Amino acid sequence: MKFTIVFAGLLGVFLAPALANYNINVNDDNNNAGSGQQSVSVNNEHNVANVDNNNGWDSWNSIWDYGNGFAATRLFQKKTCIVHKMNKEVMPSIQSLDALVKEKKLQGKGPGGPPPKGLMYSVNPNKVDDLSKFGKNIANMCRGIPTYMAEEMQEASLFFYSGTCYTTSVLWIVDISFCGDTVEN
């Protein structure tokens, strides 16, 4: 009986961190560019990461749903939500997200480290009618606001793109740019 209790206790001690949610907060102490504060919450049980960028009216939040392969970003200034497929070759896995953020923060690299990977998306001007196909997390975040689908532009560069883009930079790991008419207004 004592063995069972000890075993259950040890199992709980070692299993709890693997299934728990964790939060990572990164403050931009040198807030010259007005990047504000970012926080990442990861729910390993549901395979979802939530990134919040708090910078006044230029704030946004993003959900990366690793379970269904979609991500959504809600742009508060534009009052829109943009959904796109996750490029798993560029975006960090949910397992490595914690390690990447801690490495950047603890080593003090921040914006001075290696350049972030970049993704560029073209936003379809037609509104999405059915949010349920993207999963309940994305549907809940985007419910009640205009939502658009975006397609990744392969081999694209902001340097050569002449249209208007809105760029979200996630913890110096990945820059995601949304380009098209819906981000101009």
Swiss-Prot record:
Signal sequence, start to end: 1-20
Disulfide bonds, paired cysteine numbers: 81-142
Domain BRICHOS residues, every copy: 54-150
UniProt keyword list: Disulfide bond, Golgi apparatus, Mitogen, Secreted, Signal
A Pfam family per the record: BRICHOS
Effect after changing residue 104 to T: In a breast cancer sample; somatic mutation
Protein origin, superkingdom: Eukaryota
A GO CC annotation given for this chain: extracellular space
GO BP terms, alphabetized: digestion; positive regulation of cell division; positive regulation of cell population proliferation; regulation of cell population proliferation
Cellular localization per UniProt: Secreted; Cytoplasmic granule; Golgi apparatus
Tissue expression per record: Expressed in stomach (at protein level). No expression is detected in cancer tissue or gastric cancer cell lines.
GO molecular function: growth factor activity
Matches recorded under InterPro entries: BRICHOS_dom, Gastrokine
Record family assignment: Belongs to the gastrokine family.
Function: Has mitogenic activity and may be involved in maintaining the integrity of the gastric mucosal epithelium.
PANTHER family, per the entry: GASTROKINE 1
Protein name in UniProt: Gastrokine-1
